[in-house]
């Protein structure tokens, strides 16, 4: 502290106080004064350097405070922005969750409605007429086999049984509506065609029926069978899967038999029965039997043509309930 005190006391060169110092200290000369001046200048420079350091330190502290305040303000703004962003994300998340929940609820409702529609479209196929029709269809190949083996008497008996089942299934379905089914409307003519095809092929094989008549009957039945598969595909609503296509309980179309088709069925059964009985009762190649062959060919071709001309009335697509 001594240099600073001396410096405060000596603020300017000591030329004017040389005599006093010489008198007090007992020294004299200009060299002593010069030494004092140099000492005062050095101590003043040191004091100025100390003041500069303090001033710079205060400046740096102020600058750091300002920088810290700016950073604090920036962090505060970012915190506010982050809170707003987080709030927006939470609101968006809640909106998406509600939207997904609502969409899932709608899908579940739609699935329930679709299941109810499919259940309504299904029908009971385990009816007595359908069982009789199925038994006739299963028996048809065996009747053909018996005829090919030459057992015409057994073949006649089985044919009579098949004819009785054909009459019974129709009577039961008309008398008791609960036993009627749209599936049966397709199954019955298909079983008749299977029976007729088995019989005409086996009778033609044993030379009891002409080849041309067999060709007409088989061609007509194959044509109608193919048309039935096409109509089934057209009338089946999406999705058109293999399992739904062959699902017998899911009926999409109905076959309306015509008067001509019923007459043709009777004529065909009479022709088959009489041709099968010819070797039993010995009237092979009888003119009346040959005339019946031509009549059967005519009615068979006429029914095929009528199905084509009146296909919109014969095959009815079942409209879905709205």
Curated annotation (Swiss-Prot):
Q: Name one Pfam family in it.
A: CDP-OH_P_transf
Q: What is its EC number?
A: 2.7.8.41
Q: Which GO terms describe its cellular component?
A: mitochondrial inner membrane; mitochondrion
Q: Which residues form a coiled coil?
A: none
**Protein's UniProt keywords contain Transmembrane:** yes
List the Gene3D superfamilies hit by this protein, alphabetically: 1.20.120.1760
TM regions (residue ranges): 143-163, 199-219, 289-309
Keyword Membrane found: yes
Catalytic function, reaction form: a CDP-1,2-diacyl-sn-glycerol + a 1,2-diacyl-sn-glycero-3-phospho-(1'-sn-glycerol) = a cardiolipin + CMP + H(+)
A single GO molecular-function term is:
cardiolipin synthase (CMP-forming)
Q: Which GO terms describe its biological process?
A: cardiolipin biosynthetic process; mitochondrial membrane organization
- Judged by the first EC level, this protein's enzyme class is transferase
Subcellular localization(s) per the UniProt record: Mitochondrion inner membrane
Keywords in alphabetical order: Lipid biosynthesis, Lipid metabolism, Membrane, Mitochondrion, Mitochondrion inner membrane, Phospholipid biosynthesis, Phospholipid metabolism, Transferase, Transmembrane, Transmembrane helix
> Which pairs of Cys residues are joined through disulfide bonds in the record?
none
The family classification in the record reads:
Belongs to the CDP-alcohol phosphatidyltransferase class-I family.
Q: What does this protein do?
A: Catalyzes the synthesis of cardiolipin (CL) (diphosphatidylglycerol) by specifically transferring a phosphatidyl group from CDP-diacylglycerol to phosphatidylglycerol (PG). CL is a key phospholipid in mitochondrial membranes and plays important roles in maintaining the functional integrity and dynamics of mitochondria under both optimal and stress conditions.
Q: What is this protein called?
A: Probable cardiolipin synthase (CMP-forming)
Q: Which organism is it from?
A: Drosophila melanogaster
């Amino acid at each position: 502290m001594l240099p600073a005190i001396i410096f405060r006391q000596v603020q300017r060169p000591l030329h004017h106080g040389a005599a006093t110092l010489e008198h007090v200290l007992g020294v004299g000369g200009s060299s002593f004064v010069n030494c004092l001046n140099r000492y005062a200048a050095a101590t003043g420079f040191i004091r100025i350097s100390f003041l500069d350091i303090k001033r710079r330190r205060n400046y740096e502290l102020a600058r750091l405070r300002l920088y810290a305040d700016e950073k604090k303000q920036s962090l505060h703004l970012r915190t506010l922005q982050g809170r707003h962003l987080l709030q927006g994300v939470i609101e968006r998340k809640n909106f998406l969750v509600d939207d997904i929940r609502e969409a899932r609820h709608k899908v579940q409702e739609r699935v329930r409605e679709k299941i109810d529609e499919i259940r309504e479209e299904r029908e009971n196929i385990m009816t007595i007429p359908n069982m009789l029709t199925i038994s006739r269809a299963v028996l048809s190949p065996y009747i053909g086999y018996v005829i090919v083996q030459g057992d015409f008497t057994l073949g006649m008996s089985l044919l009579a049984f098949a004819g009785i089942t054909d009459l019974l299934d129709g009577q039961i379905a008309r008398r008791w509506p609960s036993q009627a089914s749209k599936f049966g409307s397709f199954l019955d003519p298909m079983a008749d065609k299977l029976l007729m095809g088995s019989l005409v092929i086996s009778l033609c094989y044993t030379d009891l029926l002409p080849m041309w008549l067999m060709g007409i009957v088989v061609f007509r039945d194959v044509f109608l069978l193919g048309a039935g598969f096409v109509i089934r595909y057209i009338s089946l609503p999406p999705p058109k899967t293999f399992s739904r296509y062959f699902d017998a309980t899911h009926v999409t179309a109905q076959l309306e038999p015509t008067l001509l088709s019923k007459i043709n069925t009777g004529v065909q059964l009479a022709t088959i029965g009489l041709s099968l009985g010819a070797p039993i009762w010995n009237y092979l190649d009888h003119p009346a039997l040959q005339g019946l062959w031509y009549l059967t060919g005519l009615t068979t071709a006429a029914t095929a043509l009528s199905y084509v001309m009146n296909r919109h009335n014969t095959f009815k697509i079942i409209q879905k309930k709205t």
